[in-house]
């Protein structure tokens, strides 16, 4: 079976920037375990100096003391860490009419994603080229594969990318074969002479003599 590249519909707005959360220096710390603070008391100070738009709320000035500050920062830390760990998580759904895979690819730009089918398998590839920051080098690679259900036409596979960074790949399920209508075939009755033919009639006459 030949390989086919599946184009996906880009549902993001034109102003969307896939690296908008990557620009601040501290916004890349979740990509490396050694960039995280070790103790809860350090979280408050670390988050207070972090430039993470959309991830962490500013710590209220009224909060005093390391324990109170850590308690205020912990929910924000959990949200950010949960978002990081959710990257690459997929969900497969199959109904009588449709087969669908949803994959979180929020860390990849549209031009870094490729969807193709080959030998009844959907292959999704996402790759970041190696980038350097103050902590070292960062690179990502995503290569999940999904086997299409039997009977699914690979040429009908389509994909789309949502504004939230969810890649959806889907295909219609094959329709079950329609059962043919029952047909009764009539049996035609033939006389004995017709069944035996002319030669049979002559044999009977010879026997009578």
Swiss-Prot record:
Residues 74-209 are annotated as: Interaction with TGFB1I1. Residues 80-188 form the sHSP domain. Phosphorylated upon exposure to protein kinase C activators and heat shock. Phosphorylation by MAPKAPK2 and MAPKAPK3 in response to stress dissociates HSPB1 from large small heat-shock protein (sHsps) oligomers and impairs its chaperone activity and ability to protect against oxidative stress effectively. Phosphorylation by MAPKAPK5 in response to PKA stimulation induces F-actin rearrangement. CDD domains: ACD_HspB1_like. Pfam families: HSP20 (PF00011). GO terms for biological process: anterograde axonal protein transport; chaperone-mediated protein folding; negative regulation of apoptotic process; protein refolding; regulation of protein phosphorylation; response to heat. It is found in: Cytoplasm; Nucleus; Cytoplasm, Cytoskeleton, Spindle. PROSITE patterns: SHSP. One of its GO terms (molecular function) is identical protein binding. It comes from the Eukaryota. The modification Omega-N-methylarginine is found at residue 12. The modification Phosphoserine is found at residues 13, 15, 27, 82, 86-87, 90, 102, 180, 203. Keywords: Acetylation, Chaperone, Cytoplasm, Cytoskeleton, Methylation, Nucleus, Phosphoprotein, Stress response. GO terms for cellular component: axon cytoplasm; cytoplasm; nucleus; spindle. Coiled coil: none annotated. Homooligomer. Homodimer; becomes monomeric upon activation. Heterooligomer; with HSPB6. Associates with alpha- and beta-tubulin. Interacts with TGFB1I1. Interacts with CRYAB. Interacts with HSPB8. Interacts with HSPBAP1. Small heat shock protein which functions as a molecular chaperone probably maintaining denatured proteins in a folding-competent state. Plays a role in stress resistance and actin organization. Through its molecular chaperone activity may regulate numerous biological processes including the phosphorylation and the axonal transport of neurofilament proteins. Belongs to the small heat shock protein (HSP20) family. This is Heat shock protein beta-1. The gene is HSPB1.
């Amino acid at each position: 079976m030949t390989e086919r590249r599946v184009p996906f519909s880009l549902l993001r707005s034109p102003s969307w920037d896939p690296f908008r959360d990557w620009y601040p220096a501290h916004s890349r710390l979740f990509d490396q375990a050694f960039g995280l603070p070790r103790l809860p008391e350090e979280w408050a100070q670390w988050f207070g100096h972090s430039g993470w738009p959309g991830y962490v709320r500013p710590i209220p000035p009224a909060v005093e003391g390391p324990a109170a500050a850590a308690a205020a920062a912990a929910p924000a830390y959990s949200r950010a860490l949960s978002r990081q760990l959710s990257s690459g998580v997929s969900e497969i759904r199959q109904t009588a009419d449709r087969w669908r895979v949803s994959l979180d690819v929020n860390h990849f730009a549209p031009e870094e994603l490729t969807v193709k089918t080959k030998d009844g398998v959907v292959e999704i590839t996402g790759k970041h080229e190696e980038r350097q920051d103050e902590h070292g080098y960062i690179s990502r690679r995503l290569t999940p594969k999904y086997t299409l259900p039997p009977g699914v036409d690979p040429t009908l596979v389509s994909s789309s990318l949502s504004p939230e960074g969810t890649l959806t790949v889907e295909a219609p399920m094959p329709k079950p074969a329609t059962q043919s209508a029952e047909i009764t075939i009539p049996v035609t009755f033939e006389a004995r002479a017709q069944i035996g033919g002319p030669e049979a009639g002559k044999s009977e006459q010879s026997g009578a003599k």
